Amino acid sequence: MKTIMLVCAAGVSTGMLVSNMQKAAKEKDVETDIFAVSPNEADGYLSTKEIDIVLLGPQVKFLKDQLKEKISSKNIPIEIIDMRDFEHMDGAAILDRALKLV
């Protein structure tokens, strides 16, 4: 199972994106645990849960270096979600990109 954590401003759009990614994973028969957290919650999840990849919403891309430093010892990839894919809520494209990085 691949665990994918999205860090975002925790809005409605991210909830829809998580749902679209979960649907795409089910269609591809890929076992995943995909969830979204706010920037304030990210540290807690990174220290208590096995995360395979961190995806940042475009609106919080400024956090990349800060989070990368915190997870450098864990070798967890961190990636900013493509703005176009985010705007189109393209869960399949975002999932494919995430799976290529793990």
How would you label these PLM feature ranges?
Residues 48-53:
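Short acidic/histidine-rich motifs immediately flanking catalytic phosphotransfer sites
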Residues 57-59:
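Short secondary-structure boundary segments
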Residues 3, 77-102:
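Ser/Thr/Gly-rich flexible loops in soluble cytosolic domains mediating phosphotransfer, phosphorylation
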Residues 2-5, 9-41:
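Conserved active-site segments centered on acidic
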Residues 15-18, 61-68:
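Short, surface-exposed alpha-helical segments at coil->helix boundaries
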Residues 64-83:
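A short, gly/pro- and small-residue-rich
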